[in-house]
Regions:
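Short, well-ordered coil/turn elements that cap or connect secondary structure elements
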Residues: 103-105, 143, 164-166, 193, ...
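Membrane-anchoring hydrophobic helices of lipid-metabolizing enzymes
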Residues: 8, 12-121
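Thr-Gly-centered strand-to-loop micro-motif
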Residues: 111, 149-151, 173-174, 202, ...
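Catalytic core of membrane glycerolipid acyltransferases/transacylases, capturing the structured
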Residues: 73-95, 102-103, 118-177
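Non-catalytic C-terminal accessory region of glycerolipid acyltransferases
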Residues: 13, 181-297
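Generic preference for hydrophobic
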Residues: 110, 124, 148, 254-256
Length: 297
């Protein structure tokens, strides 16, 4: 099964990427014109002017794209809870995630995506190795409508904070148990109503050394309260993105390890969830997978 049969246009860039590429194409045309004009004049040393022309246009197109996103984000009031889905902001999130990975020269190799076909909204549980992890899952599973439970600082990031707020991402205060419980209940309600699928990192923070950190099993309460299935996934290689971004291609893996049905979830305790999910992540060996799907961005 090819990824282009599984993923919608957001994975391939869609409309915003078409506009972006259109601007780059204009820059390329200007570069060619400069090249030919100076070639006809036989001033070979002036041909080097073509590169700055194209580079300047590329940077201008990129800056314009993100400037428009920034201006749009200023219209979002992040103090008000989101009441209904926004197809526009979901589309924008998928497109921007794709563009960021494209600019970063990141290639995603996936296994197990076929397990998500026909699945109702679910709780996605995965390991956490990089700030790019949510982007990987969003691009790999654009039809799932993922919304993550994230630390409050994420919502202070320009553009990002506004877009994810409109897509039902939730802030969690780990220092205040009462507020944290409120976030868990809100996530369970969204999942139960079928509004979004919820993504969590039970480690609670990024693993800086690559090892799997102890789980905080409270996050599994979301699936139990919502009566929803749990999807166990593993991300590999994202810790390399930050120091290679745009300079070198980075290949990362996103593997769907197992899916626990809602009936199975109802019979297990949160501790059992944690132990099982952790064991799956530790025992998984992506290199032995027989069905691999590549998403080139």
């Amino acid at each position: 099964m090819k990824c282009d049969k599984v993923l919608p246009s957001a994975e391939k860039g869609g409309i915003s990427m078409a506009v972006y590429i259109g601007l780059i194409t204009i820059g390329a045309a200007m570069t060619i014109e400069t090249f030919l004009r100076h070639a006809l004049l036989r001033r070979w040393y002036d041909l080097f002017l073509a590169l700055p022309v194209w580079l300047g246009w590329f940077l201008a197109a990129t800056a314009l794209y993100f400037l428009l996103l920034y201006l749009l984000s200023l219209t979002v009031d992040k103090t008000k809870p989101v009441q209904k889905k926004s197809s526009f902001y979901r589309w924008l999130l998928n497109e921007t995630a794709w563009l960021i990975l494209r600019l970063g020269r990141i290639r995603i190799e996936c296994t197990g995506l076929e397990k998500l076909q026909g699945l109702p909204p679910f709780l996605l549980v995965a390991n956490h190795r990089s700030n790019f992890d949510p982007f990987i899952a969003i691009v790999a599973c654009p039809r799932s409508g993922l919304a993550y439970i994230a630390k409050p600082e994420i919502f202070d990031i320009p553009i990002t904070g506004s877009v994810v707020h409109k897509c039902f991402f939730l802030s969690i205060d780990r220092e205040d148990n009462r507020k944290a419980l409120g976030t868990i209940l809100r996530a369970a309600a969204l999942l139960r109503d079928g509004t979004v699928s919820i993504g969590v990192y039970p480690e609670g923070t990024r693993s800086k050394m690559g090892e799997l950190l102890p789980f905080r099993n409270g996050a599994f309460q979301i699936a139990k309260r919502a009566g929803a299935p749990i999807v166990i996934a593993k991300t590999t290689g994202t810790e390399q993105i930050a120091h290679r971004f745009a300079r070198r291609r980075t290949v990362v893996r996103f593997d769907i390890l197992d899916v626990l049905s809602a009936d199975t979830v109802a019979k297990m305790t949160t501790r059992e969830f944690g132990e099982y999910a952790r064991a799956q992540m530790l025992q998984s060996e992506p290199a032995t997978s027989t069905k691999k799907e590549a998403i080139t961005v």
